[in-house]
């Protein structure tokens, strides 16, 4: 990290976008492979969960939390999201509203319940072969990841994800890291 908050959050944003790209590749790749020897759902989950983590951590940094404070949060999405909600309740509520709409849930705790289930997805699914069980709602994970990406893009670049994507990050940033 450079200590330049704007630079660092944008760099974190691009890194999270790269993990999102990897997750999307894992989702789409099996359709183009004739003889498959791997199941790509697990890498899709791991990359999506890690992208969510980095998106949220970039938001925390953007809102004034120090790197030391962020590091103490570890990987848990529930705790990270709770910290963001405490920092910017209005934006968090907007993201939660957008994420829960496709599910048409009347449960006011729907988002929290989903985050409870997937909070440790990065750690749990990364080592799923060790034999412990894990559960996740893929639709929620994907919608949450994509909404975080859009929200971060709006926050850091004042443009929609579609606008950012069509311009390419090279024209939005002075660096390419």
Annotate each predicted stretch with a short phrase.
Residues 1-13, 65-177:
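Long, charged low-complexity segments
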Residues 1-46, 59-66, 168-177:
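Charged alpha-helical initiation segments
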Residues 20, 24, 52, 149-156:
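Structural signal for well-ordered, non-membrane alpha-helices
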Residues 48-57:
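Conserved beta-strand->loop/alpha-helix structural units within folded catalytic cores of enzymes
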Residues 42, 52, 123:
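Residue-level detector of short, conserved catalytic/binding motifs and their immediate flanks
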